[in-house]
């Protein structure tokens, strides 16, 4: 009798709806399947472009319940690379990133909004140069699925823009150069 009761309860539990949780991913920086690039107008005539070579992060994502998503990214600001050694030294100085005092930047999401057609708005707190302010990353889902090595991956692209002075960056190159645009490519490996 006890065996039948246990079997019935176990069978009934399989019929109950199960909660679907967002999957956890680690950003694939080891395989170089992610990047954080920046661009700043150079006096209104051209653009200075560069990237951060060292960062890591994680995110949670469920396409059926996007609003449950979470993102966290840590950036080694000493890894700034604009392909020009003297400029990179200046970018690390207290005129810009002040890496001696603030060697890391961090983004932590506070909300993720589904805008339809794979578009997401990821709002969160960006900590840079000792200042934390909200920013919104306008992102797009590239795709997700099995990889050839037996894992599962999800990929996104996104961008955001902010004013340097909002983050205590002292250098003033004029109004044409006041903003920084960040372009992000993220591929995560499901954990």
UniProtKB/Swiss-Prot annotation:
Stored SUPFAM superfamilies: YceI-like
- Cellular compartments per GO CC: periplasmic space
Which Gene3D superfamilies does the annotation name? Lipid/polyisoprenoid-binding, YceI-like (2.40.128.110)
Transmembrane found in the keyword field: no
Q: Which UniProt key words apply to this protein?
A: Periplasm, Signal
Q: Which Pfam families match?
A: YceI
- Per the UniProt entry, the signal peptide is 1-22
User: Where would you find this protein in the cell?
Assistant: Periplasm
> Mind telling me which InterPro entries this protein's record contains?
Lipid/polyisoprenoid-bd_YceI, TTHA0802/YceI-like_sf, UPF0312/YceI
Q: Does the keyword Phosphoprotein apply?
A: no
Q: Which domain of life is it from?
A: Bacteria
Its main localization is periplasm
User: Per the similarity annotation, which family is this?
Assistant: Belongs to the UPF0312 family. Type 1 subfamily.
**What's this protein's name?**
UPF0312 protein Sden_2128
Q: What is the lineage of its organism?
A: Bacteria, Pseudomonadati, Pseudomonadota, Gammaproteobacteria, Alteromonadales
């Amino acid at each position: 009798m006890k065996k039948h009761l246990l079997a019935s309860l176990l069978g009934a539990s399989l019929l109950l709806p199960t909660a679907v949780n967002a999957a956890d991913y680690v950003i694939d920086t080891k395989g170089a399947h992610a990047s954080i690039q920046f661009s700043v107008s150079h006096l209104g005539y051209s653009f200075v472009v560069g990237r951060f070579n060292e960062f890591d992060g994680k995110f949670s994502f469920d396409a059926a319940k996007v609003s449950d998503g979470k993102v966290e990214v840590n950036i080694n600001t000493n890894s700034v690379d604009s392909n020009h050694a003297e400029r990179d030294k200046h970018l690390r100085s207290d005129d810009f990133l002040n890496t001696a005092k603030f060697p890391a930047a961090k983004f932590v999401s506070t909300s993720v909004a589904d805008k339809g057609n794979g578009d997401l708005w990821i709002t969160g707190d960006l900590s840079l140069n000792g200042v934390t302010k909200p920013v919104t990353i306008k992102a797009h889902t590239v795709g997700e699925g099995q990889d050839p090595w037996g894992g599962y991956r999800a990929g996104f692209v996104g961008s955001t823009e902010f004013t340097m002075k909002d983050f205590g960056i002292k250098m003033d190159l004029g109004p044409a150069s006041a903003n920084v645009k960040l372009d992000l490519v993220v591929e995560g490996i499901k954990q």
